[in-house]
Amino acid sequence: MASNVTNKMDPHSMNSRVFIGNLNTLVVKKSDVEAIFSKYGKIAGCSVHKGFAFVQYDKEKNARAAVAGEDGRMIASQVVDINLAAEPKVNRGNAGVKRSAAEMYGSSFDLDYGFQRDYYDGMYSFPARVPPPPPIALAVVPSKRQRLSGNTSRRGKSGFNSKSGKRGSSKSGKLKGDDLQAIKQELTQIKQKVDSLLENLEKIEKEQSKQEVEVKNAKSEEEQSSSSMKKDETHVKMESEGGAEDSAEEGDPLDDDVNEDQGDDQLELIKDDEKEAEEGEDDRDSTNGQDDS
């Protein structure tokens, strides 16, 4: 069995490669394709995809013989469209009766013709007056092949249009240089803005720290003043209470004088009473004496 390599881009491989379009790949397998095309020469590689296939021969004459012998043939109830990979057909007519995709796969089967268009458009630059080739029926393309087609299209353009490729590369290089300069300027501006913002943030932090220190100092001063005021108030209270007690103990000097005067009066009264009593006794004695005489 031949290998699966059918994507070499050298001129010899391109000219000895056969493209088979409108192939019913639900029925036709790789072994069937090799059996049909091996009669024209030795096959170096064969790859079957959804709706189409490639056959790589060792010699260009074998590939041309296969195109001449098999183009328009009915394979698995479909008329295949065969040509050299290096010489695609510009206008493909509706040779024979082709079955629609709805008949083959049902109404829900989706077709993707993008790979076939990209494959030929990338390799060849058609004149403006010639329309691009129409899509080949049942050319459903897998995602892996699409990525390969992007690489092949770039290679094809660089191989056949070297001057345009060089010009495009020089322009892209200049554009890249300009873009780099612009990006560099933008980055420097952003850096300056960031530095200024950082400086502003540092200033704000310093101011906030100063304000916090001032607030703390003010609070401490208030606390100290309030504590000193409380101490003074307590001292004054203590002094006032002590003075009241002293005054209560000492008493009023006027009251003492009054008390002394009252005591003197009482003594005088007592003395007067004693005198009167003595005088009364003397009178009695004198009257008694007179009576005795």
UniProtKB/Swiss-Prot annotation:
Bias class Acidic residues marks the residues at 242-267, 275-284
The coiled-coil segments of this chain are: 177-225
Q: Which InterPro entries match?
A: hnRNP_C (IPR017347), Nucleotide-bd_a/b_plait_sf (IPR012677), RBD_domain_sf (IPR035979), RRM_dom (IPR000504), RRM_HNRPC/RALY_subfam (IPR051186)
Q: Which family does it belong to?
A: Belongs to the RRM HNRPC family. RALY subfamily.
Write down the species.
Homo sapiens (Human)
Query: What's the name of the protein?
Result: Heterogeneous nuclear ribonucleoprotein C-like 1
- Matching SMART domains: RRM
Q: Which Gene3D superfamilies match?
A: 3.30.70.330
Q: Where in the cell is it found?
A: Nucleus
What is a single molecular function from GO for this protein?
A: identical protein binding
Is Secreted tagged as a keyword?
no
Q: Which PROSITE patterns match?
A: RRM
Q: What does this protein do?
A: May play a role in nucleosome assembly by neutralizing basic proteins such as A and B core hnRNPs.
Question: Where in this protein does the record put region Disordered?
Answer: 137-177, 206-293
Segments forming domain RRM: 16-87
Organism phylogeny: Eukaryota, Metazoa, Chordata, Craniata, Vertebrata
